[in-house]
Structures are given as C-alpha cells and as structure tokens.
C-alpha cells in the first residue's frame, strides 16, 4: 500500500494542468460558521476515493492558521446526539475516513491514541476540549493540487466545555499552515515524515512550487463583508496598511509584547465624555503596567486577557458579564450600544514593533468588529456579545482581533512572523499579490488610509465641548487641520474687522476728551494740592471726596469688566462594573483535568481500547 501511494503521488504530479509560478491563493468558503462568529474558513478536500483515484472524498471548511497538525473532524462526530440532536459540524463538512484509500492512522504510535483525553486546540485552554482523537496522515487537495502525507489529528468525537461546565459540540476543524520545520518526523527506528500544505508546495511542489515556505493572511469579517485573504508563499499587499511588526516566532507560536489597550475615536464626536482613554490593560492590576506577552492565534476565537483587563474594557461599555459563558453580552437596548457600534470608535492595541523594543505599533479594532453573535447550540436565540474572555490561561489574541489585522510568517532562514493593520469593508479588495522572498523575507505595507476603508460604515457623532482625552498616553490621532474657509467664515471676519476698527476709533476719541478735561481742571485744583503737600498731611478718601464731581469720577473710573468663564464638569458617565470574579493568578501553561458537567455521561477513559477506534 505504501509503494502504491508513492507511485500515485508521482503520477498525480505529471497530470496537473494548473501551473503556479508564484504565491498560491487559497479559496474561501462561501459559508460562514459559528456558533460564536460568524467566522470565515477556507475550503480543502481531504482523502482520496478508492473507486476513482482522481476524485478526493470529502470537501471540508477549516479555520486556517494553526501550526504543526491540522485537526480534522470525522463524520462519526454526528453519531453522538446527546449534546444536540442537530449536527452543526455538517455545515462545514466532515471527513469520511472509511472512504479514503490513502489514510494511514496506524503507523504513528504517539498520542493521542484514539482514547478519550484532553486535546490541545490553539494556545489557550480557557474553553478546554475533551475528545477521542488520534494521529494520522492523509492527502489534502487544494484547488486541484494533491499534497500527500499531511500531518493530521482526526477527531472521532468530542466537545468543548464553557465555564458553567456545559459541553457543546465541535463544529469546524483547523488547517495547519506549517511549522519551523519542513516536515514533522515521528519514530526512532523507522522514521515517518509528515508534511504541511505550504511546506510541500515549497519543497516538492514541482510545477506548483511556491517561492517560499510562508503565508500571509487576513481572515476578514463575514458580517461586514470583508472577504478573507490567504496566500501561500506570499501575501496580498492591499491587506497590509502602514507599518509592519516583525517578530521572532517560538516553535509554532507567534508571541508579541502588548504594552497597552486604549479606547479611541477616529473622527467626529465621541460616545463617551472623552475621545481617548488609555492604560486599560493594566487598570486594576499594576503588575501589567510594563505590558504582557500575548500569542496571536487564528485557531482560537476570542480575545483572552487577564480578568482585570477585560473588566476595565467592559466598564466603558454597555455590556454585562455572563459567567456561564465567560463572555460579556451587549445591552442592545442601551442608547450607547448603537452610538459605539456605528461611530468611528475602536480599541487600539499597542505592541512592541520589533525585538529591539525601541518602537511601537498600534492595531485598531473598530467596535463594529467586536459585536459578534452567539447562536445555537450555545444559546436559544442569537445574542450579541463582546469577545473578551477573562482567563488565567495563556493570553491569546484570536480571530476576534485578527478580523482587523494582517498576520503572516516566513518559516525558514531565521524567519520572522508579521503583524500589521488590515483594511475595513470599504477597501477595494483588488488583489495585489506580493512575494515573500526566500532568503530576505519582508512584508511591505501599502500607503492606503485605514480611516478611508471604514468611512462608508461609520456615522461620526457631533462633537461636543465636554469631550477630552484621558490617560497619560492620550492619542493625538483625532486632531485635524483645515486650511480652507467657508463663505460664512469670511463674512464673519470682515464684519468683525469693521466692528473692531470702530471700537479702536471710539477709544482714541474718548482718550482725547478725557485728556482735555484733565488739563482744564488741573489749574483750579493746583492750590489745594499744593496746600496739602506743604502741610505734609497724608491725603485720604475724605479729603479727595471734596474734589469736583467730574474730577472724582475721572480719578475713580472703573476698568471695563472682564469676561468670565466657568469650567463645567467634565466627568463622564459611570458604569457599574461586572460581577466580581476571582483574582488573576500567575499565568502559566498548566492544564487542569476537566470532568464532565454536561447533561450526559462521559465514557470511562479507560474503557475505550485502540481497537474500538477503527
């Protein structure tokens, strides 16, 4: 069987009709997926049909961006209807492993072995997954190009457990986009080499070779009509705006130093009593004042931060913490809800731009992208939520953040991973493919205006005099200049100049009259002042009161009143904090064992043998 598979691989390389001389653009599904999105996914075909070698078996949609193994949901996932009578995973497609002649699920003798156990899914365990899974290899076909021996983890059954202990079914698998190695090798005596879709196309792609072992991606937004973009061996430059962060990766993860999170307004008035508020990351937790290392991970859905940080963000929003889900639900009846979501309001994430820590880069995420929807089976009716999940697990910026950001990596030659601002729904989305060079990797941003890609979506609020900036790092992004004057302004200047000239003339005339009067009356009072001086007697108000009425008025004339100003209250509205939760403990990677809390019984972990997998 092994020899046949290798012969089949060589044969298929010769029968390819499509030629790719540059980066390979992936195809995105026309559907969107939940139950906490909507999210976008790419289409691939897994396995090969035994009756017709050229017809793969199962088309599935996968969330792209993982590293090392791809996680594929099997059709047997729908056998368990205890969680839900509806198999939501069927919408994205399931892999029927029984019909694939190229599947190998026995050669790799390493965990997971096909028994029930905790399963790593991304880089946070805030919503742990318990599954019956095992290692395997099989073919994956992308746009007519078959890729053999792809590293997989097949999931026969499983669920995810939310903070209330309720279990919910899995719905969409993940597509690995490589690792720091071209292959993942298993075994000591007999070595088994597995591959990844982009490493194979780079190393053995033949006529479909891509220029580098890399990718560039912007997952976009299904709800706002921002199409997804994924290129293997390159990137779409129109999805990269402005400066680009370049960081070292750690194994298959993308760590970066997050310095602060602030709230801002791109233009117009603010839904708050201020236009900018910073230091929200460390609010309530001074240990975060110097920043926090987070991991950017497209396979996890939410923004996972310490509890104090999520609470600080929530305190500025009309949201309520829901402990059953570990998420914040929007109060859609609050007038602030529509103001915030439709105006140019955003969260700004300030990062270290590079490993030298001598520059920053800011990624802005409009609140319109942070108005996501929970659907069945998580909730009975669609519910809007704010995707910050408090966690003591590894802090992660997942798909909710990456709707507004470009992410990419060049795996080889001491490569780097990249982060940049991505455009909004008013961008042209005309693909401008750029190559990631093999030995001199870099990503260049476009000169497009980020604000312009959102103007059609936003309705700026009227500006008020009570708005101010708040925080020590208040941004000046909202300052504007206008060199042109309207007709009304010009007329106002002319009228003002005329009035001002008349006022100056009146002052001069008044001064002359007063001066003449003073000269006339000075002689009549000369003797009196002389007498007072000779007697060396101090004058007082009583003596001066004997002067003439006109002279007394001149000597005691009051200056014109000055215009007075009152400073009103600039304090904004206050919001009740979410219910108090447990304090944040030291972050770590330790995972707790998770017992079943759902309305069904788990199979005994020791009761499932390897033979039952097949």
Question: Where in this protein do the model-derived segments appear?
Answer:
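Fungal secretory targeting signals
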Residues: 1-34, 61-64, 71-72, 510, ...
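Aspartyl protease catalytic domain
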Residues: 21-36, 146-286
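Signature of the N-terminal lobe/flap region of pepsin-like aspartyl proteases
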Residues: 34-163
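Short hydrophobic beta-strand that contains or immediately precedes a catalytic carboxylate
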Residues: 57-65, 72-73, 294-298, 304, ...
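Conserved beta-strand elements of beta-rich interaction domains across eukaryotes
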Residues: 68-69, 180-182, 222, 235-239, ...
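Extracytoplasmic, non-cytosolic globular domains
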Residues: 237-238, 248, 290-335
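Aspartic protease catalytic domain
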Residues: 344-489, 496, 500, 514
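C-terminal membrane-anchoring module of eukaryotic surface/secreted proteins
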Residues: 445-605, 612-613
């Amino acid at each position: 069987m092994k020899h046949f598979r290798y012969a089949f691989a060589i044969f298929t390389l010769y029968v390819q009709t499509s030629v790719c001389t540059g980066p390979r653009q992936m195809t995105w599904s026309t559907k969107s997926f939940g139950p906490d999105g909507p999210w976008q996914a790419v289409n691939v075909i897994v396995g090969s049909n035994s009756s017709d070698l050229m017809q793969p078996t199962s088309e599935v949609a996968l969330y792209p961006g993982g590293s090392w193994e791809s996680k594929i949901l099997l059709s047997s996932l729908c056998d368990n209807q205890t969680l839900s009578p509806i198999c939501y995973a069927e919408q994205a497609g399931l892999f029927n492993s029984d019909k694939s002649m190229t599947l190998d699920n026995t050669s790799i003798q390493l965990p997971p072995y096909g028994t029930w156990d905790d399963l790593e899914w991304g880089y946070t365990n805030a919503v742990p997954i318990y599954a019956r899974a095992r290692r395997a290899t099989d073919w994956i076909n992308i746009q007519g190009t078959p890729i053999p021996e792809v590293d997989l983890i097949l999931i026969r059954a499983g669920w995810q457990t939310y903070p209330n202990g309720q279990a919910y079914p899995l719905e969409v698998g993940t597509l690995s986009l490589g690792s720091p190695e071209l292959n993942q090798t298993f075994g000591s005596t007999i070595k088994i080499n597995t591959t990844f879709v982009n490493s194979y196309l780079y190393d053995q792609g033949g006529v479909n070779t891509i220029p580098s072992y890399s990718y560039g991606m912007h997952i976009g937004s299904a709800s706002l009509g921002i199409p997804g973009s994924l290129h293997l061996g390159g990137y779409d430059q129109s999805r990269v705006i402005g400066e680009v962060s370049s960081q070292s990766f750690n194994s298959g993860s993308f760590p970066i130093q997050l310095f602060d999170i602030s709230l801002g307004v791109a233009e117009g008035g603010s839904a708050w009593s201020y236009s900018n508020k910073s230091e929200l990351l460390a609010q309530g937790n001074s240990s975060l004042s110097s920043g926090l290392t987070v991991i950017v991970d497209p396979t996890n859905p939410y923004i996972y931060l310490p509890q104090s940080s999520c609470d600080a963000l929530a305190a500025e929003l009309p949201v309520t913490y829901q402990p059953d889900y570990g998420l914040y639900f929007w109060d859609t009846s609050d007038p602030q809800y529509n103001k915030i979501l439709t105006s140019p309001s955003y969260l700004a994430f300030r990062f270290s731009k590079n490993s030298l820590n001598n520059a920053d880069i800011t990624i802005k995420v409009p609140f319109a992208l942070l108005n996501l929807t929970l659907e069945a089976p998580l909730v009975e009716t669609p519910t809007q939520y704010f995707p910050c999940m408090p966690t003591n697990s590894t802090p992660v910026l997942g798909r909710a953040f990456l709707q507004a950001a470009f992410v990419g990596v060049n795996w080889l030659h001491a490569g780097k991973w990249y982060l940049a601002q991505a455009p909004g729904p008013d961008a042209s989305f005309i693909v401008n493919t750029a190559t990631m060079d093999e030995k001199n990797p870099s990503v260049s941003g476009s000169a497009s205006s980020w604000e312009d890609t959102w103007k059609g979506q936003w309705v700026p609020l009227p500006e008020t005099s009570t708005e101010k900036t708040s925080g020590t790092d208040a941004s000046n992004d909202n300052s504007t200049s206008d060199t042109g004057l309207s007709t009304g302004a010009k007329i106002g200047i002319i009228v003002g100049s005329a009035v001002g000239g008349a006022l100056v003339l009146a002052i001069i005339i008044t001064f002359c009259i007063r001066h003449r009067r003073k000269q006339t009356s000075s002689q009549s009072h000369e003797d009196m002042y002389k007498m007072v001086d000779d007697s060396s007697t101090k004058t007082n108000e009583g003596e001066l009161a004997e002067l003439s009425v006109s002279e007394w008025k001149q000597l005691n004339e009051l200056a014109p009143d000055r215009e007075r100003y009152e400073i009103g209250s600039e304090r904004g509205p206050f919001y009740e904090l979410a219910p108090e939760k447990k304090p944040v403990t030291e972050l770590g990677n330790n995972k707790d064992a998770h017992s079943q809390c759902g309305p069904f019984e788990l199979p005994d972990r020791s009761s499932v043998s390897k033979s039952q997998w097949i």
